[in-house]
Amino acid sequence: MTLLSDNKAVLIAGPTASGKSALALELAQKAGAVIINTDSMQVYHDLRVLTARPAPEDEALVPHRLYGHVDAAVNYSAGHYVRDAAQVLDEVRREGRLPVFIGGTGLYFKALTRGLSAVPPVPDDIREAVRLKLDRDGVEALHAELARRDAAAAARLNVRDRTRIARALEVIEATGRPLADWHAETTPPLLPPERTHALFIAPEREALYARIDARFETMLEAGALAEVERLAARGLDPLLPAMKAHGVPALIRYLRGEITREEAATIGKADTRHYAKRQFTWFRHQLPEFEWMSPEAAKGLVRALKVR
């Protein structure tokens, strides 16, 4: 594979803690590239430490875009991301620079390379009404309502899946159409697969899991707990994406005195390991065009680059 050819964008995906950021930084420094975040949690300003965003000194070395530009109170979606990414990509191309998209959120990569379903934004008042109904009546009642209004969606969703049940009802309430109808309509992709070089960094599993555990402890020592304490003090909706970032719910429980610090760390590590496992499975089945390689092979590929 040649990473620098034909004005193609570079996509670097992989599980959390796989060394993607360091690889992207080395590539960007060598090629004069712009690094564009493709991680759904690193967009949040409030969670620099706990989401392992690039360090400020690394961000100063090359341009980094779409990091920390969203407040935790925002229900930031793949649709928001694609709109922001389109603007950044246009700017990068006008500058004549190489765009390097890096992250672990498969849905974002799929939206970039396959297009996005055309679901219109749900008005805030409808979203709030559904959330209030969820809190008042419980998830089983909402699932029963969904079964009456969109039987196919209700059959697909777990009866305890609060987030997806609420989302399906919001879309029906706002548009009068089931979510599946909207998913059948997609927008043209920003980055068709033939216009990209796409890598998936695949470390050895046990080494990755050990690195995840060690990194979680490092993040706690580096200020993640204080970060979560500030976030919890805002009293935000626990269903917001930022409030469900790996480690946030467990650390909030610790701050409330419900569990010990050790228990919170154990939960946070386990949640992150399970997420990494799902990332392997998701990319293998959903985006088979990504070329899988070990971190060592990817580093060798970058270091062998000859930049004109």
Swiss-Prot record:
What is this protein's record name?
Answer: tRNA dimethylallyltransferase
EC assignment: the record states 2.5.1.75
Q: Which domain of life is it from?
A: Bacteria
The record's note on quaternary structure and interaction partners says: Monomer.
Q: Where is this region: Interaction with substrate tRNA?
A: 39-42
One Gene Ontology term of the molecular function aspect: ATP binding
- InterPro entries recorded: Dimethylallyltransferase, IPT, P-loop_NTPase
What is the enzyme's main class? transferase
| One GO process term, biological-process aspect | tRNA modification
UniProt-annotated site: Interaction with substrate tRNA, residues: T105, R127
Q: Which family does it belong to?
A: Belongs to the IPP transferase family.
Outline what the protein does: Catalyzes the transfer of a dimethylallyl group onto the adenine at position 37 in tRNAs that read codons beginning with uridine, leading to the formation of N6-(dimethylallyl)adenosine (i(6)A).
Keywords tagged on the record = ATP-binding, Magnesium, Nucleotide-binding, Transferase, tRNA processing
Q: Which cofactor does it need?
A: Mg(2+)
